[in-house]
């Protein structure tokens, strides 16, 4: 009897090792694939809505998701950043001729919403791609919300995928959990945000000690590069995260004027050179990698697919070359993410985005199409393919 118990325990142990061996880990300050025993270059797009496509009962939505992943794989993307537990609440409009608007509700733990993530993770696994899963959209410092966050984490991370039989906390197709997807706080609230992230990390670690944990961080232009790098280092150390995702949105953060998105690029590049160099120095010594998430608007703030994106393409080319340079020099910047992928989404025949479920990288309460990279944006797609394949 004891012998059979020993064999059973051994098999369970081996199974756990198998799951652990497929995880992406930190090794000497680098993202490391324990299966291939090699470093990982982080080449990502934000596609928050991917689980919604997978959960839809409309077969065309699932077909779109499959085709989007095929396109991303062809471009060279290996990570898709998504949002967990999401539901769209439709908001009626006063004008009956208009389609309903929508808002995003998060921390939804009903079983039906696991269906989409189950499907997505299975499709990513088929393509040797990974998911980075945000557990909420934005940071919310309300204590009641924090309690709900903890309940959601417990339920979500212990869910068993109906297609693969693997519990999420053991699933190697998940590269990391991200505390939240967006950062909407001012500099004065940074200490509160740091405490909140620390609490969230502790909550996640109690359930899952295998996956990496990420959190977003936004540079404060009011500080010089060295001061902001020290702030990033302190934030990483105090929260216990494995990797920071630095959000760079030049127009929204005041790096360039909205009236000079092309003319302002040279000055933007000089500023980012200084910040990235400072980040590399500080983060390398702490043996913690970081990535950058970038977004840039279309020329003249167009919102339709295939409209001119020359400024954005120049910015993406700069960022791609900067990431390649840092990786070759074994610096702390390990990769980048594009916010985000709109893929096959299209407005109506008048060029108006009137359908909430025609998902783009923008949330329903944001200007649809402004930052999205669509399949029809051939020149932008070519730039991304060149930069991603270069690595």
Each predicted region: which residue ranges?
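Boundary at the C-terminal end of the N-terminal hydrophobic targeting segment
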Residues: 17-22
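Sec-dependent N-terminal signal peptides
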Residues: 4-14
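Short acidic/histidine-rich active-site segments
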Residues: 291-297
């Amino acid at each position: 009897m004891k012998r059979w118990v020993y064999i059973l325990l051994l098999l369970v142990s081996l199974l756990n090792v198998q799951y652990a061996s497929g995880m992406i880990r930190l090794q000497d300050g680098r993202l490391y694939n324990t299966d291939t025993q090699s470093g990982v270059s982080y080449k990502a797009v934000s596609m928050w809505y991917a689980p919604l496509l997978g959960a839809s009962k409309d077969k065309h939505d699932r077909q779109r998701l499959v085709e989007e992943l095929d396109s991303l794989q062809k471009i060279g993307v290996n990570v898709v950043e998504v949002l967990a537990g999401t539901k769209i609440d439709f908001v009626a409009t006063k004008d009956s001729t208009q389609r309903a608007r929508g808002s995003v509700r998060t921390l939804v733990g009903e079983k039906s919403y696991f269906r989409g993530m189950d499907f997505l993770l299975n499709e990513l696994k088929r393509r040797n791609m990974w998911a980075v899963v945000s557990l909420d959209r934005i940071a919310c410092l309300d204590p009641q919300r924090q309690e709900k966050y903890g309940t959601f984490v417990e339920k979500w991370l212990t869910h068993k995928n109906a297609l693969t039989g693997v519990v999420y906390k053991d699933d190697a197709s998940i590269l990391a959990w991200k505390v939240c997807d967006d950062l909407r706080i001012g500099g004065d609230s940074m200490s509160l945000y740091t405490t909140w992230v620390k609490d969230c990390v502790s909550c996640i670690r109690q359930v899952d000690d295998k996956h990496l944990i990420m959190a977003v961080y936004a540079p404060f232009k009011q500080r010089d590069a060295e001061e902001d790098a020290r702030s990033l280092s302190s934030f990483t150390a105090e929260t216990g995260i494995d990797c920071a995702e630095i959000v760079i949105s030049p127009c929204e953060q005041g790096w360039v004027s909205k009236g000079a998105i092309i003319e302002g690029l040279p000055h933007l590049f000089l500023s980012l050179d200084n910040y990235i160099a400072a980040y590399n120095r500080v983060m390398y010594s702490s043996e913690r990698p970081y990535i950058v998430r970038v977004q840039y608007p279309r020329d003249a703030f167009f919102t339709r697919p295939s409209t001119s994106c020359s400024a954005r393409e120049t910015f993406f080319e700069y960022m791609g070359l900067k990431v390649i340079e840092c990786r070759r020099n074994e610096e702390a910047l390990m990769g980048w993410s594009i916010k985000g992928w709109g893929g096959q989404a299209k407005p109506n025949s008048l060029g108006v985005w009137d359908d909430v479920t025609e998902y783009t990288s923008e949330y329903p309460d944001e200007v649809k199409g402004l930052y999205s990279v669509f399949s029809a944006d051939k020149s932008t797609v070519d730039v991304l393919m060149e930069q991603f394949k270069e690595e």
